[in-house]
UniProtKB/Swiss-Prot annotation:
Keyword hit for Cytoplasm: yes
InterPro entries, sorted: GHMP_kinase_C_dom, GHMP_kinase_C_sf, GHMP_kinase_N_dom, GHMP_knse_ATP-bd_CS, Homoserine_kinase, Ribosomal_Su5_D2-typ_SF, Ribsml_uS5_D2-typ_fold_subgr
Protein name per UniProt: Homoserine kinase
Biological-process GO terms, alphabetical: threonine biosynthetic process
MF terms (GO), sorted A to Z: ATP binding; homoserine kinase activity
Keywords: Amino-acid biosynthesis, ATP-binding, Cytoplasm, Kinase, Nucleotide-binding, Threonine biosynthesis, Transferase
PANTHER family: HOMOSERINE KINASE, HOMOSERINE/4-DIPHOSPHOCYTIDYL-2-C-METHYL-D-ERYTHRITOL KINASE
Localisation per UniProt entry: Cytoplasm
Catalysed reactions listed for this entry: L-homoserine + ATP = O-phospho-L-homoserine + ADP + H(+)
EC number: 2.7.1.39
Binding of ATP, residues: 82-92
Annotated organism of origin: Clostridium botulinum (strain 657 / Type Ba4)
Length: 297
């Protein structure tokens, strides 16, 4: 049996739209084995127990590339990453499927080939790269080649995810974005993305609040998330380092100093006054990324 663990990811980190992403210690686990025949799923809803399941789609893509034909598969899923909340659940399924398929087939593909294949299936390197490699990454696609660099994050920082009880599909969140942007808005984000990386590198945490600002995606998507601005304002009052929309949302991610012991309790009290239910979850950066059979890929 192959066991794969993949972390959740939070993409964009404010100004770093479609390029920055970070892995956090919330995980999906996949247990896969080859059987005599058939396709058996465990741990997911009945509507996902078929060949359209994203994990199986990713596995088949890998098998086809390698030229391996399993006689049958049993796929067990233990999921801790909420779906359609902006925490990289799709990326986790794709990475988990491809890595487990490659392992079943004898480990034919190398790390670069696995990564390129995962981005081809999932389409979002800002989620796939940190899920695969761990830590924070800056990613681009250049002539269909996936290129990334790990971002050094100074010690002393943690995250807090505010996860609502409602979902928001990536497709819907993409649909509200403009077809074009002003030149000045592009410059606004480029500068702040550079500032974010530098601030995290050097431990200049007081600069993060400026680097979280953007003009490319968050304001457009905020209208899809009830009470986004009031929650953001409350987080800022509680001395957060920065607040941003996690991926396409609706989860709101907060950056905090590691020694901050009061934020979670205080923001939870505020969220309880709102219409929707919100889960408050403190998180750390996952530095390992995807692990297969207890070893880093």
């Amino acid at each position: 049996m192959v066991e794969v663990r993949v972390p959740a990811t939070s993409a964009n980190i404010g100004s770093g739209f479609d390029c920055l992403g970070v892995a956090v210690n919330m995980y999906n686990k996949f247990f896969v084995e080859e059987i005599e025949e058939g396709l058996i799923f465990e741990g997911c809803a009945d509507k996902f127990k078929n060949e359209d399941n994203l994990i199986y789609v990713a596995m088949k893509k890998c098998f086809d590339k390698i030229g391996y034909k399993p006689t049958g598969l049993r796929i067990k899923i233990e999921s801790d990453i909420p779906v359609s909340r902006g925490l990289g659940s799709s990326a986790a399924c794709v990475v988990g499927g491809i890595v487990s398929a490659n392992e079943l087939a004898g480990g034919v593909l190398n790390k670069k080939e696995l990564l390129d294949l995962a981005v081809e299936v999932e389409g979002h390197p800002d989620n796939v790269n940190p899920a695969f490699c761990g830590g924070m990454t800056a990613s681009i696609s250049d002539n269909r080649e996936v290129i990334y660099s790990k971002v050094k994050v100074s010690e002393g920082i943690k995250f807090c995810a505010l996860i609502p009880d409602f979902t928001l599909s990536t497709e819907k969140a993409r649909a509200v974005l403009p077809k074009s942007i002003d030149y000045k808005d592009g410059i606004f984000n480029v500068g702040r993305t550079a500032l974010m990386i530098s601030a995290l590198n050097n431990g200049d945490f007081h600069l993060i609040k400026y680097a979280c600002k953007d003009k490319l995606h968050q304001d457009y998507r905020a209208k899809l998330i009830e009470n986004f601005y009031s929650i953001k304002e409350e987080c800022e009052k509680l001395n957060s380092l920065g607040v941003f929309l996690s991926g396409a949302g609706p989860t709101i991610m907060v950056m905090l100093r590691e020694e901050d012991k009061d934020f979670s309790k205080n923001i939870k009290s505020f969220l309880e006054t709102l219409k929707n239910k919100w889960e408050v979850r403190e998180l750390k950066i996952d530095k390992l990324g995807t692990v297969v059979n207890n070893r880093k890929v």
